[in-house]
Amino acid sequence: MASMQEVDALVVGAGFGGLWMTNRLKEAGLNVLCVEKAPQAGGVWYWNCYPGARVDSRYPVYQYSDESLCKDWNWSELFPGYEEIRKYLSYAVDKWQLNSHIRYNTTVTGARFDESDHKWTVEGINGSHGTIRIRCRWYILALGFASKPYIPDFEGLNRFQGPCFHSSAWPQEGIDLKGRRVAVVGTGASAVQIIQTISKEVGHLTVYQRTPCTAMPMRQQSLTPEYQDNFKASGEMAATMRRTKYERFGGQDVQFVSRRWHEDTPEQRRAVFEQAWQKGGFHLLLSTYFEVFDDVEVNHAAWRFWAEKSRERIHNTKYKDILAPLEAVHAFGGKRTPFEQDYFEAFNRRNVDLIDMKASPILSFAEKGIITQNEGLQEFDVIILATGFDTNTGALTSIHIQDTDGILLKDRWSYDGVMTTFGMSTSKFPNMFFFYGPQAPTAFSNGPSCIELQGEFVEELILDMIGKGVTRVDTTSEAEKRWKESTLSLWNQFVFSSTKGFYTGENIPGKKAEPLNWFGGFPRYRKALTECRDGGYKEYSLRSLPKVPDPEHRGLIDKVAVVTSAQPVGA
């Protein structure tokens, strides 16, 4: 039988959210353990190591707001790549002295709550010690919103004899693509970065597209240490971090123009779009007119502007209509809008072909390649599946987590749809919290900013409960219903609600179609969390363990002693 380990709090995941929460609870005096599937910190930035992988959030917001970290760290680029993010997170682990609190190579497989002592028993597999069991009062899941890859059920997928893998399973040691025949299936955010990078070195690249990708210019720049040192010394960096975290809609340092679309002339509208386009990044979506979100006419105008600008860069007339059709095929922004550096130019290369899967769907995979309706067999040496993720809920429901009735989380949400309070807790799973998941700002926010907002709330809640002697915290079904109504109401106000995709889970066959992100923006989200805390956590049912006589005559004590120390897992 596996040995039992006891801690106050267990954090699952050593990415941005897990490391941040582990540090905060450690600093608060709790005995906290973080477990991570990978052999090092990084979260999704460990697994996503494909060529060109980098953030979509512009410097300085994609980092922790902790000034002690910012002081001694400088970035090399406006949009850092995965290697640099890995180094940054390792730096945070060292700076925060977290190594003794993290167990790597550990996969959590299941968890159940014990009503007798208000603790979770969590089971998993450790690479060195085999099966492990951990007991904790507080169970915190920081798994990332896009950490469960999705691969469509292609006919004959396993027949292909060469390397074939999902973009998030890119070999850590890399793979030599020089001169080889490569296929990329998909044109989402990961595919954009892969295609524009490998097209310069492969012998031949064939891209399989189902839906046009509304990729926008990144406007990448190098950053000098001198610029960053001055930015920090002036106080502007700290001000930017506070502003984006507490005042901006999605945690990005951009904001909409104050004027309405219909107040401007056509020339003024064009000038607003042009200015945003030149700045790049999120500006076309988040610094033009708010009506891009809630007015179909304005949204379609934004699409057409994007299409016209993108088509100027595509030489092949046929490819123009496939990659950037003038008429919107879905709401602009209704699917993720990744940032590119020379994505569209890649299709001007003689060694790059494009197959429109709407006109010529994939029929099957074969030993030597992929068979499509019109082209027949195309032979490849390597196939890359950039086919997306089961976002928001996939990682959570992959773990065998039982509620107080013994029902699995995946079954609860398949019956009722996703039910949460603030996108962080769900009823009948007491003392369990999750970050950057369903019904939170998640996909419409800057990850580190969202994680810190949520983490601050959970930390304060836990410390408040410890101070009051509360041992069981469970959100109410009434609070869940209100939050779900808020999620639905907000989503239905915007033109995105007409678009099928991972924002609603419709990229996964059989998954219930519903909005998986709360679209109210950071200021409103923070206000809701603050009101809950200041109101005494009325959205939660609070209970304490019964007191029993102390056999050593020290008065009344909890029925089960509070754990104050623990040995490392496997010790």
Swiss-Prot record:
GO BP, one annotated term: (M)-viriditoxin biosynthetic process
Details of cofactor binding: Binds 1 FAD per subunit.
Site (Transition state stabilizer): 336
Family label: Belongs to the FAD-binding monooxygenase family.
Listed cofactors: FAD
Metabolic or biological pathway: Secondary metabolite biosynthesis
Function in brief: FAD-binding monooxygenase; part of the gene cluster that mediates the biosynthesis of viriditoxin, one of the 'classical' secondary metabolites produced by fungi and that has antibacterial activity. The first step is performed by the polyketide synthase VdtA which condenses one acetyl-CoA and 6 malonyl-CoA units to form the heptaketide monomer backbone of viriditoxin. The product of VdtA is then O-methylated on C7 by the O-methyltransferase VdtC. The O-methyl group is important for the stereoselective coupling of the monomers at the final step of viriditoxin biosynthesis.
PANTHER family in alphabetical order: L-ORNITHINE N(5)-MONOOXYGENASE-RELATED
Gene Ontology MF term list: flavin adenine dinucleotide binding; monooxygenase activity; N,N-dimethylaniline monooxygenase activity; NADP binding; polyketide synthase activity
Name of the protein in question: FAD-binding monooxygenase VdtE
Catalytic activity: 9,10-dihydroxy-7-methoxy-3-(2-oxopropyl)-1H-benzo[g]isochromen-1-one + NADPH + O2 + H(+) = methyl 2-[(3S)-9,10-dihydroxy-7-methoxy-1-oxo-1H,3H,4H-naphtho[2,3-c]pyran-3-yl]acetate + NADP(+) + H2O; (3S)-9,10-dihydroxy-7-methoxy-3-(2-oxopropyl)-1H,3H,4H-naphtho[2,3-c]pyran-1-one + NADPH + O2 + H(+) = semiviriditoxin + NADP(+) + H2O
Keyword entries, A-Z: FAD, Flavoprotein, Monooxygenase, NADP, Oxidoreductase
InterPro entries, alphabetized: FAD-binding_Monooxygenases, FAD/NAD-bd_sf, Flavin_mOase-like
Gene3D superfamilies reported for this sequence: FAD/NAD(P)-binding domain
Knocked-out gene: effects: Impairs the conversion of the ketone group into a methyl-ester group to yield semi-viriditoxin.
Residues reported to bind FAD: 44-47, 56-57, 62
EC numbers, comma separated: 1.14.13.-
Residues that bind NADP(+): 54-56, 187-193, 210-211
